Amino acid sequence: AAYHSLDIEWGNHDILWMGAFFGNAALICNLLRINCLYRNLQVIETYGINLRPLMSFALEEYADDDCENFVISDLYGIESELERNAVLRKMTKAVTVLQLKLENELIRNHPEFGMDDHILLRDDTLTEKEKWLVNHLIGEFSTNDRLRKHVNFLLKKGSMYKVFNG
Protein backbone atom coordinates (compact mmCIF):
# COMPACT_ATOMS: atom_id res chain seq x y z
CA ALA A 1 0.00 0.00 0.00
CA ALA A 2 1.23 3.48 -0.83
CA TYR A 3 0.96 6.20 1.77
CA HIS A 4 1.75 9.38 -0.13
CA SER A 5 0.57 11.88 2.47
CA LEU A 6 1.46 10.13 5.68
CA ASP A 7 3.97 11.13 8.27
CA ILE A 8 4.44 10.02 11.84
CA GLU A 9 5.82 11.91 14.79
CA TRP A 10 7.66 9.36 16.92
CA GLY A 11 6.71 9.06 20.56
CA ASN A 12 8.61 7.44 23.40
CA HIS A 13 7.11 4.03 22.72
CA ASP A 14 7.98 4.17 19.01
CA ILE A 15 11.58 4.89 19.92
CA LEU A 16 11.56 2.01 22.43
CA TRP A 17 10.36 -0.38 19.73
CA MET A 18 12.93 0.88 17.22
CA GLY A 19 15.75 0.59 19.77
CA ALA A 20 14.57 -2.88 20.74
CA PHE A 21 14.60 -4.01 17.11
CA PHE A 22 18.12 -2.65 16.70
CA GLY A 23 19.24 -4.75 19.68
CA ASN A 24 19.53 -2.27 22.54
CA ALA A 25 19.12 -4.60 25.50
CA ALA A 26 18.21 -1.84 27.98
CA LEU A 27 15.40 -0.67 25.68
CA ILE A 28 14.19 -4.25 25.20
CA CYS A 29 13.95 -4.65 28.98
CA ASN A 30 12.24 -1.27 29.35
CA LEU A 31 9.69 -2.21 26.69
CA LEU A 32 9.05 -5.59 28.34
CA ARG A 33 8.80 -4.02 31.80
CA ILE A 34 6.12 -1.61 30.63
CA ASN A 35 4.18 -4.34 28.84
CA CYS A 36 4.38 -6.66 31.88
CA LEU A 37 3.39 -3.89 34.26
CA TYR A 38 0.28 -3.04 32.24
CA ARG A 39 -0.63 -6.63 31.35
CA ASN A 40 -0.09 -5.91 27.70
CA LEU A 41 1.94 -8.94 26.68
CA GLN A 42 -0.45 -9.72 23.83
CA VAL A 43 1.35 -7.00 21.86
CA ILE A 44 4.66 -8.84 22.32
CA GLU A 45 3.00 -12.17 21.53
CA THR A 46 1.50 -10.72 18.32
CA TYR A 47 5.06 -10.38 17.05
CA GLY A 48 5.75 -14.01 17.94
CA ILE A 49 8.41 -13.06 20.47
CA ASN A 50 9.12 -15.99 22.78
CA LEU A 51 8.84 -14.85 26.40
CA ARG A 52 8.92 -18.35 27.90
CA PRO A 53 12.63 -18.07 28.83
CA LEU A 54 11.88 -14.79 30.64
CA MET A 55 8.97 -16.37 32.49
CA SER A 56 11.04 -19.45 33.44
CA PHE A 57 13.93 -17.27 34.62
CA ALA A 58 11.61 -15.06 36.68
CA LEU A 59 9.84 -18.02 38.30
CA GLU A 60 13.16 -19.64 39.20
CA GLU A 61 15.01 -16.49 40.26
CA TYR A 62 12.17 -15.14 42.39
CA ALA A 63 10.59 -18.43 43.52
CA ASP A 64 10.60 -17.33 47.17
CA ASP A 65 9.74 -13.68 46.50
CA ASP A 66 6.12 -12.61 46.02
CA CYS A 67 7.42 -9.42 44.34
CA GLU A 68 4.67 -7.47 46.08
CA ASN A 69 6.32 -4.14 45.19
CA PHE A 70 5.73 -4.86 41.51
CA VAL A 71 2.01 -4.20 41.34
CA ILE A 72 0.39 -5.08 38.04
CA SER A 73 -1.94 -2.41 36.69
CA ASP A 74 -5.52 -3.38 35.92
CA LEU A 75 -5.55 -0.94 33.01
CA TYR A 76 -8.46 -2.56 31.20
CA GLY A 77 -10.61 -3.43 34.22
CA ILE A 78 -10.01 -7.13 33.74
CA GLU A 79 -9.22 -8.69 37.08
CA SER A 80 -7.17 -11.72 36.06
CA GLU A 81 -6.52 -14.63 38.34
CA LEU A 82 -4.06 -14.01 41.17
CA GLU A 83 -1.67 -16.71 39.97
CA ARG A 84 -1.16 -14.95 36.62
CA ASN A 85 -0.58 -11.66 38.43
CA ALA A 86 2.06 -13.36 40.58
CA VAL A 87 3.87 -14.55 37.45
CA LEU A 88 3.64 -11.08 35.89
CA ARG A 89 5.02 -9.49 39.07
CA LYS A 90 8.00 -11.85 38.93
CA MET A 91 8.53 -11.15 35.23
CA THR A 92 8.26 -7.41 35.90
CA LYS A 93 10.87 -7.63 38.65
CA ALA A 94 13.17 -9.72 36.46
CA VAL A 95 13.12 -7.28 33.53
CA THR A 96 13.35 -4.28 35.87
CA VAL A 97 16.52 -5.64 37.47
CA LEU A 98 17.94 -6.45 34.03
CA GLN A 99 17.02 -2.98 32.77
CA LEU A 100 18.73 -1.28 35.72
CA LYS A 101 21.88 -3.38 35.31
CA LEU A 102 22.03 -2.65 31.59
CA GLU A 103 21.36 1.06 32.09
CA ASN A 104 24.14 1.20 34.70
CA GLU A 105 26.52 -0.23 32.09
CA LEU A 106 25.46 2.41 29.56
CA ILE A 107 25.90 5.19 32.13
CA ARG A 108 29.37 3.94 33.11
CA ASN A 109 30.42 3.62 29.47
CA HIS A 110 29.32 7.19 28.78
CA PRO A 111 30.42 9.51 31.61
CA GLU A 112 29.69 12.44 29.28
CA PHE A 113 25.99 11.78 29.92
CA GLY A 114 26.51 13.07 33.48
CA MET A 115 24.06 10.50 34.83
CA ASP A 116 26.07 8.83 37.61
CA ASP A 117 23.29 9.76 40.05
CA HIS A 118 20.98 7.45 38.06
CA ILE A 119 22.97 4.33 38.99
CA LEU A 120 20.51 2.56 41.27
CA LEU A 121 22.13 -0.86 41.82
CA ARG A 122 25.47 -1.56 43.43
CA ASP A 123 25.65 -5.16 42.31
CA ASP A 124 24.99 -4.75 38.62
CA THR A 125 27.04 -7.49 37.02
CA LEU A 126 24.93 -9.78 34.86
CA THR A 127 24.93 -13.42 35.92
CA GLU A 128 25.50 -16.10 33.28
CA LYS A 129 21.74 -16.83 33.23
CA GLU A 130 20.99 -13.13 32.81
CA LYS A 131 23.52 -12.85 29.97
CA TRP A 132 21.91 -15.81 28.21
CA LEU A 133 18.43 -14.33 28.69
CA VAL A 134 19.49 -10.90 27.41
CA ASN A 135 21.09 -12.48 24.33
CA HIS A 136 17.93 -14.52 23.75
CA LEU A 137 15.76 -11.39 23.96
CA ILE A 138 18.05 -9.45 21.64
CA GLY A 139 17.75 -12.27 19.11
CA GLU A 140 13.97 -12.41 19.44
CA PHE A 141 13.60 -8.68 18.75
CA SER A 142 16.39 -8.06 16.24
CA THR A 143 15.55 -10.97 13.93
CA ASN A 144 11.79 -10.52 13.98
CA ASP A 145 10.60 -9.99 10.40
CA ARG A 146 7.24 -8.47 11.30
CA LEU A 147 8.87 -6.01 13.71
CA ARG A 148 11.49 -5.19 11.04
CA LYS A 149 8.71 -4.23 8.61
CA HIS A 150 6.99 -2.04 11.20
CA VAL A 151 10.24 -0.35 12.27
CA ASN A 152 11.23 0.29 8.64
CA PHE A 153 7.81 1.87 8.08
CA LEU A 154 8.29 4.11 11.14
CA LEU A 155 11.77 5.09 9.95
CA LYS A 156 10.60 5.79 6.40
CA LYS A 157 7.47 7.76 7.28
CA GLY A 158 8.37 9.24 10.65
CA SER A 159 10.67 11.58 12.49
CA MET A 160 11.05 13.07 15.94
CA TYR A 161 9.40 16.40 15.27
CA LYS A 162 9.16 17.28 11.58
CA VAL A 163 5.61 16.61 10.48
CA PHE A 164 4.36 17.71 7.10
CA ASN A 165 1.43 16.39 5.09
CA GLY A 166 1.39 17.30 1.48
In which residue ranges do the predicted regions lie?
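Feature recognizes metal-dependent phosphohydrolase scaffolds
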Residues: 1-166
